[in-house]
Swiss-Prot record:
InterPro entries in the record: Ig-like_dom, Ig-like_dom_sf, Ig-like_fold, Ig/MHC_CS, Ig_C1-set, MHC_class-I_related, MHC_I-like_Ag-recog, MHC_I-like_Ag-recog_sf
Name the record gives this protein: DLA class I histocompatibility antigen, A9/A9 alpha chain
Native source species: Canis lupus familiaris
General function of this protein: Involved in the presentation of foreign antigens to the immune system.
Subcellular location: Membrane
Residue span of region Disordered: 333-362
Regions annotated as coiled coil: none
Amino acid sequence: MEVVMPRALLVLLSAALALTPTRAGSHSLRYFYTSVSRPGAGDPRFIAVGYVDDTQFVRFDSDAATGRMEPRAPWVEQEGPEYWDRQTRTIKETARTFRVDLDTLRGYYNQSEAGSHTRQTMYGCDLGPDGRLLRGYSQDAYDGADYIALNEDLRSWTAADTAAQITQRKWEAAGVAELQWRNYLETTCVEWLRRYLEMGKETLLRADPPSTRVTHHPVSDHEVTLRCWALGFYPAEITLTWQRDGEDQTQDTEVVDTRPAGDGTFQKWAAVVVPSGQEQRYTCHVQHEGLPEPITRRWEPSPLSTIVIVSIAALVLLVVAGVIGAVIWRKQRSGGKGPGYSHAARDDSAQGSDVSLTAPRV
């Protein structure tokens, strides 16, 4: 299996500048490569994307009409033509390498030429708040399963199976980790990450606080789901926790992965199922870099719901008052003049009419 990286990447990233991040917190530069074979339909499709923190800034698709590495963030567009030419040459070289790798891997696993297979790589570096390297990494996968990974010491490899051990032996013999990956991750990757952070600092170093709310969803006659939402925040790192009377409900909380909102920000929610009528005992706590301090949210019934409840109660009272008034009026009409009183005798024609009663006979 050929060495995929970072030989070509060293050419691409040789013009690195040493710049210092201007915001506390860690940052990352990561690349994701995917090659998918398609027997009978030509060369494998190759897609590459690059991310600074949570922002995609470059992309290449071998099926795209341009056939070039393309910018995906406004701040990287300020790079000149030479940068994009180098990026394109490098990524096309990597695509060719991946095409060969797919054939090699198919042989390692004794697979036929009929099926489609996938080769993936993720690599990059993380910087700490002081601008120094926290960690470097390179991980390879085949058909969705781990294949081989660079260890934290940046000097050795971990193979996932016997096929990957073949690659491991080749790379160890060639000194791939020590001579290429370690140098790239400790030096070149760090320098380019600092450069990108400086170029895109207005976007990358911002901290957009989340907008938060709690929604109410009946589950049954006895239970409801309270869902705590965090929307429109950046960067993606955020913590949502539910508490009941001040005690964490981690084990009973359903939390989804942070998701891109499509506008450069992120969204996330965490939910708990609670007994009906006990909603006010539960609080959602949100922590994010864009917040001066953590915030707490409870479910608050909407004003419309309160108006409806009050209106229904008032209507019930009016109905009850009307019934009581009708009963009193009927009593006054029929027997409300005291005991011993009796109607005077009258003709049948007077029954049911409003004629005055005649004086009783003596």
